Every structure is written in C-alpha cells, then in structure tokens.
C-alpha cells in the first residue's frame, strides 16, 4: 500500500457523485479514480473522464488478465471495475484516491485496501426519494429505474455493518459538513 483512499458507495441515485465532486473541489490532493464499465456512455459522458468505456468482451479479457483491483457484473453484461493501472497512476502523483463505486465494489475495495481506506455508505432518506431522484435525473428508462429501485433495497441490506461510516443524504449542506469532518479526521489519523 502506498497512500490513503476514500471509498464512496451508494445505490444509484443516492447522491454520491454530488458529494464526491464537492470534496474534489475542496481538496486539490484528492483525485477521482475513474472506473471502467461495459455500459454505453450517458449523455455527454466521455471515455477517460467519467469512465473508461470498455465493451463486455474486452472487460472479460481484462478480468482474465487480473487487471482489476475489483470488478462486478452489476447487471447482465454490465460490468464495473477498478483497474490496477488507475490506482498506480494516482498514487504515482502522491494523491489520495477517491472511489465512487457500487456497494459490492465498496466492500471489496475496503477489503483490498484495509486500514488505508475509509469507506462511506451514502444512504437516501427513503426508497421513495431515491426513485424520485432517478426519475428527475432523466437519464434512464422507466424499466431501468424500476430495476435500480428494486436493487437498492438488497444493496442497503447487504451493506449493513460493512462500511466505516453511513451518511444519510437528506439535507445536502448538512451532508457536506458531516463528510468534511469525517474526511478531515481520517486524513489526520
């Protein structure tokens, strides 16, 4: 292990990207770990910026080559993972790695990095609020939203007791203040 990592996990739509982007704006020494995915880009997403977009066949080859710290088939033929080369790239610059991953990915990353990592589970105030956020995001079909909402309950159940800290994202300003204090404590430890 070389440096520290902060892992953010949540069901889709819980607000983890908003919180991660807030922290990245406050801390120039933080760097976002770009995940790899086999899903197609949404909207204006660009390869190498939001994600490394890799087709499912190539993703499977990289898994076979042990190129990932962690990976997960989140939906059929929809893979997400953290490339070892991405971790090496960020640590080579002396930066703190920020992960924005699904719940299973967060648990796997915490196991991999151990005490070098702080893992944070971001929780929506309710499943109904999560569904409202996904609808308002406007990037997914009604079928995809229903699938994500159904998955959220099982993800939250799986996550119980597996994260260092749970942040309820109800009031965004309060969530920012709470996570800033936790991050400062972790970095000073």
Residue locations for each model-derived region?
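Pre-Walker A (Motif I) flank of P-loop NTPase domains
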Residues: 2-6
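P-loop (Walker A) phosphate-binding loop of NTP-binding proteins
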Residues: 9-11
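ATP-binding Walker
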Residues: 14
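Walker A/P-loop
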Residues: 17
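Post-Walker A helix-loop "phosphate-sensing" segment adjacent to the P-loop in P-loop NTPases
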Residues: 25-33
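ATP-dependent small-molecule kinase phosphotransfer cores
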Residues: 37-97, 104-107
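Conserved phosphate-donor/acceptor-positioning beta-strand/loop module used by diverse small-molecule
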Residues: 97-102, 112-136
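Small-molecule kinase domains that catalyze NTP-dependent phosphoryl transfer to phosphate-bearing small molecules
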Residues: 139-182
């Amino acid at each position: 292990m070389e440096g520290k990592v902060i892992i953010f996990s949540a069901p889709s739509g819980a607000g983890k990207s908003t919180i991660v982007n807030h922290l990245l704006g406050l801390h120039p020494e933080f760097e976002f770990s770009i995940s790899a995915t086999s899903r197609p880009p949404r909207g204006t997403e660009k390869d190498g910026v939001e994600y490394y977009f890799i087709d499912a066949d190539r993703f499977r080859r990289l898994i076979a080559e042990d190129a990932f710290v962690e990976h997960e088939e989140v939906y059929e033929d929809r893979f997400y993972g953290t490339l070892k080369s991405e971790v090496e790239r960020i640590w080579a610059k002396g930066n703190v790695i920020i992960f924005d991953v699904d719940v299973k990915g967060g648990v796997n990353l915490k196991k991999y990095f151990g005490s070098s990592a702080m893992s944070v589970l971001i929780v929506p105030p309710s499943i109904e609020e999560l569904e409202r956020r996904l609808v308002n995001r406007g990037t997914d079909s009604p079928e995809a939203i229903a699938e994500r909402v159904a998955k959220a309950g099982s993800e939250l159940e799986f996550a119980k007791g597996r994260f260092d800290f749970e942040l309820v994202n109800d009031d965004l300003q309060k969530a920012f203040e709470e996570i800033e204090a936790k991050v400062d404590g972790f970095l000073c430890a």
